[in-house]
Amino acid sequence: MKKTLLWALGLVVVMLGVVFAQGAATDGHVMSAPKDLKWGEPPPVFAKGATMTVVSGDPSKEGLYVVRLKMPAGYQIKPHWHPTDEHVTVISGTFSLGMGEKFDKATMTDLPAGGYALLPAQMRHYAMAKTAGIVQVHGMGPFQLTYVNPADDPSPHASQ
């Protein structure tokens, strides 16, 4: 009897843990048709020319976020890093990524639509839209981007 009761109690604790873990992941499902996405200016750490939409979550807060960045051909993001892992999926166009602290087009890898990259926390990297396109970025917030060379940071606070 005691073994059965302990086993049942253990099962309840495990099941509650699974339920709470699933509930912590999201407040509900998210489905978005492309026409429903609202595009606007990205955070000021991105150079002018790109637009961004938040697909889910809130990149300014702790927790999972998904954003999309729409860039014209030739748009560059100078060498930088993030304190958390960054997952990048190319939705359309060709997106080029390079690793290191110096922007070097010759060493970049082209990712076509459907391409994916995982950029671990602290990894120095840079990017360029080889053609006009959209990338989807997801990670754990709050989103932060630190330029290797502070002079590359286009945000107003960078000049202070």
Feature-to-residue mapping (PLM):
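Positively charged n-region of N-terminal signal peptides that target proteins for export
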Residues: 1-4
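Bacterial N-terminal signal peptides
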Residues: 8-18
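A short, N-terminal "cap"/entry segment at the start of jelly-roll beta-barrel domains
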Residues: 20-65, 152-160
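Double-stranded beta-helix
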Residues: 30, 106, 126-160
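N-terminal post-signal-peptidase region of extra-cytosolic proteins
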Residues: 52-55, 66-79
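Short acidic-glycine-tyrosine-enriched beta hairpin
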Residues: 58-60, 95, 101-122
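Glycine- and acidic-residue-biased ligand/ion/polar-headgroup-sensing regions
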Residues: 72-75, 81-102
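Short beta-strand His + acidic residue motifs that chelate non-heme Fe in jelly-roll/DSBH
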Residues: 77-79, 97-98, 119, 124-130
